[in-house]
Amino acid sequence: MKGAVFLDRDGVLVREIVLDGEARAPLRLEDFFIVDDAASQVERLHQAGFRCVVFTNQPEVARGLLSQPTLDEMHRRLSEATAVDEILVCPHVDSDGCGCRKPRPGMLLEAARRADIDLRDSFVVGDRWRDVDAGRAVGCYSILIDRPYSNCSTADASVPDLTSAVNVILARGEAPPE
């Protein structure tokens, strides 16, 4: 078993857009921008031996505001730009009651099962309480990228940006060998 780093998509690897004063996930390809340091930070994690998995809630799919082909193209671009190992998506809304929608840990458990990941040797990096709580539910070390909208006090660490989150991960030790 090996450790992994689970990265939230919006607000961590992808810039959120502001609509009506709220930070939201981009719904159009022309609004989809990968943060400047995403590729270099994923590379640092890979060099340290970590598998990098994106896990993201995308309820706009269920609401009919984001088409599956557009989401697929966004994720193709993200994979190409950052070389993440896997992207897991929950397309449901809260009322669906699925096990994959954060803060429930279903996506983390699925990734762990498929790739033989030890969740206790893994990290979650997110910008909202849902990300942190999903990680904590399965024993991951949870790092919050603190944003004005984050509203979370339960993270194991709080940092201003992705580079700082990766610094925390690497300071805690490299991933165990495969």
Q: Where in the sequence are the language-model features?
A:
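Active-site neighborhood of HAD-like aspartate-dependent phosphohydrolases
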Residues: 1-51
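Asp-based, Mg2+/Mn2+-dependent phosphohydrolase catalytic module
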Residues: 3, 68-86, 95-124, 128-178
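Active-site flanking residues adjacent to catalytic metal/cofactor-binding acidic residues
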Residues: 7-9, 56, 126-127
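Anionic group-transfer/hydrolysis microenvironments
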Residues: 10, 59, 104
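Conserved protein kinase catalytic core
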Residues: 14-16, 21, 63, 133, ...
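Residue-level signal for short segments within beta-strands and strand-turn junctions
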Residues: 15-17, 91, 146
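Flexible, glycine- and charge-enriched loops at secondary-structure boundaries
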Residues: 27-35, 64-68, 101, 155
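Substrate-recognition element of Asp-dependent hydrolases with the DxDx(T/V) motif
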Residues: 38-75, 84-96, 135
